[in-house]
């Protein structure tokens, strides 16, 4: 991945900027066919373009049937950045969403991601329940 190549070549510390791309997306997600149709986008062309870009970077990318609201996952990502080794959550969320087509707005999916990278699941539940990193994402 480009960022890893940059880190190897230069003494840099990446900072991820979170932003809610489609905050109106409901908790259950939106069907991609409808999502594209509302925007006049050819779904096959959009997939082919993204797949080509991801292949070029060596990133896995799968076809998804739905788009999901990632706001809470972003808040959890901000929290993870404050934890030792927490940066690994970003790749895990990428894989859950863009490879596994999982709803990363679902609490149990998020907790599974937290567990998969070895972070404290109870602390993560508290972060989500109390929205502790809402302001941090808003400020990004």
Q: Model regions: which residues?
A:
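Structural alpha/beta surface segment adjacent to cysteine/selenocysteine redox centers
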Residues: 2-100
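Thioredoxin-like thiol-disulfide oxidoreductase module
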Residues: 53, 126-140
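Conserved acidic, metal-coordinating active-site core of Asp-based
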Residues: 87-131
